[in-house]
Amino acid sequence: MYKVTVVIALLFLGSSLGFAQQDSIDVGVYYHPNATEEISQKEEEEIKNCLSDFLLSLQPGQNRSKTIDRSDFGLNYGFINQAQYSYAHKSSTHFKPGISFVKKIDDDTFEVKISFISATETPVLKFIHALLLKRMSDGLLSVFSTFERNTSTWNRQVVGNITYVYKDSIGFDHQRAIEMYEFSSQLAVLFGCEPIAINYYKFRNPVDLFQNIGLDYITNQYFGEMGGFALQSKRMILAANNSEYYPHELCHIYTHQNRGGNSFNPYADEGLATYLGGSGELSLAKILQYTEEVFLTDDKDTFVEFKSLYSRMPNDINFAYGISGLLVENLHREYGFEAVKELLYSGDTFESYLAVINKYLHITEANFDGRVRQLLKEYNRRNNK
């Protein structure tokens, strides 16, 4: 997974169809100049009230609404909630949501562009979000993702248990799709389940991906030339690598779908995905070779570096992903996949991860640096000759 780590959270069911009305609280939605030239004053008020109620309902402690707990909204809820959460808590990076453009599609449908600008001494544009507002049977507007509309005319092709969705102009590599299906079948054997049916959306690059899910602008989209993420609960991969093959993200879907009632550990989850599927364009072997030869100098404390799950090395790969991949590889080779599953579903804390690693590999906080360096050297001698 490349520099953008996207955490997608689905909302809890609320008690009413419409947004919670909290007229006493102003969430700060405002119009930019000339944003409403195509609409009437009445529609202008409707749109502002709808978005104010929507953003308010995302704040901690407010009522959650079924209107925004639809299956399509996992695609952009995370970004809006991040912005509104910061705004609600008046942090140094809170945002002001401004409506920069409204396009009237018909009397009951509007496309809205919202700009989130930091409310700081020197304002910074964080992102521009596209949303669809549709009038429901009760006459009120409701918020929808633009993703379904943006991809509705794309091609669809099924290979095994994978449904690929892609633009005509991108094309389709059937051989890579077969390789992805074969990898899915291998994961199914490991987890003792049937191959999981997934939807795989293929994009050229991160800019293409973000714009199609409704983010017209976000700085992250320019950080790398490839990447993507999985929506595990929806069994969907959004691949910004211009390829039909993305094994790392497929691993995340299998770990999520096979968790039962257990919470899975993020360190173990990324470790398994990197062990089996690499990260970025690099295999685990290449990642660990770089880690030992370039990154892990004598002055670094491996334990400190590892605890920061999303800290990246100069080659744009997460250090913890590679080291956790190393530990998962050792577990699998020496104790079998049941030990790996014990680590995967050990709980969502770093302490629970370390407890299982200590149980099998006798690695503690005190000896972490020495033991990991030793295992790293041994792995590279075996795999990077």
Language-model features: locations:
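Non-catalytic architectural context of zinc metalloproteases
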Residues: 21-50, 58, 62, 69-178, ...
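Extracytoplasmic/secreted envelope proteins and their assembly/folding machinery
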Residues: 48-52, 177-184, 188, 247, ...
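Juxtacatalytic substrate-recognition/specificity segment
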Residues: 154-264, 352-356
